[in-house]
Regions:
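Conserved SGNH/GDSL esterase-like catalytic core that processes O-acyl groups on lipids
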Residues: 1-92, 166-176
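Short flexible/disordered coil segments
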Residues: 47-58, 98, 104, 141-144, ...
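Extracellular/periplasmic catalytic domains that process cell-envelope and extracellular macromolecules
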Residues: 70-74, 106, 135-136, 202
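Active-site segments of SGNH/GDSL-like serine hydrolases
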Residues: 79-85, 98, 102-130
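Catalytic His-Asp segment of secreted/periplasmic serine-dependent ester chemistry enzymes
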Residues: 118-202
Length: 202
């Protein structure tokens, strides 16, 4: 997804006071703008392990998208952001997320659980589930929902689900960047990734 961390591979950013994050950008260079088969529009938690959602161009017959992603990329870290398309079945969402988290851990991958800015399910129960599971499994939590509360309109577009897409650079020397959903999503995700990198390398 070019709208998630992509500018950090494309060089279209100025870190300003966050220059301490540059070693993390360098460490994961090439990972931000590449094609990821594990990211799909409209993905539900229950379709992560459904081969019907896998990219036929990249994935083997019968292979689900997360298994395909792990085979192709051999990741050390996985951002888990689900819930916007999971409404009305919180117990199912919890069960499915547990499967994703356990799959990552079983494969030696650190899952970073990310909360979402929207309220598509009509409440905030999916974010509460995400927080609860991060605590239960003792894995990193990237609580973007808390940051979204500080943004105009939570940083969301008119559909109230997706963040507003802009083509502006991530210039963190410009105060306006701290009012934009994508710029703050990427900065906060990079901070979370930096914390994980430091913990792993200690």
């Amino acid at each position: 997804n070019p709208h998630f961390l992509g500018p950090f591979d494309q060089g279209d950013y100025k870190l300003g006071d966050f220059a301490y994050l540059q070693p993390t950008i360098d460490r994961y260079a090439g990972s931000f703008a590449r094609h990821g088969v594990g990211a799909r529009h409209g993905l539900h938690s229950w379709t992560v392990f459904d081969p019907m959602w896998a990219d036929e161009k990249w994935c083997e017959p019968g292979e689900d998208l997360i298994t395909c992603e792990f085979r192709l990329q051999n990741p050390s870290v996985l951002f888990v952001r689900l819930g916007s398309n999971d409404a009305g079945a919180p117990s199912g969402f919890r069960f499915n997320l547990k499967e994703v988290i356990e799959f990552a851990i079983d494969n030696g991958v650190v899952p970073i659980i990310g909360t979402k800015a929207d309220r598509f399910e009509g409440s905030n129960e999916n974010n509460d589930i995400l927080r609860s599971l991060a605590d239960e499994y003792d894995v990193p939590l990237w609580d973007f929902d808390r940051l979204a509360e500080t943004l105009p309109g939570r940083g969301l577009d008119t559909d109230q689900v997706h963040l507003i897409i802009d083509e502006l650079p991530h210039d963190y020397t410009d105060p306006a960047a701290f009012q934009r959903g994508h710029a703050m999503q990427d900065l906060s995700a990079l901070i979370a990734l930096d914390q994980v990198r430091r913990a792993v390398e200690e």
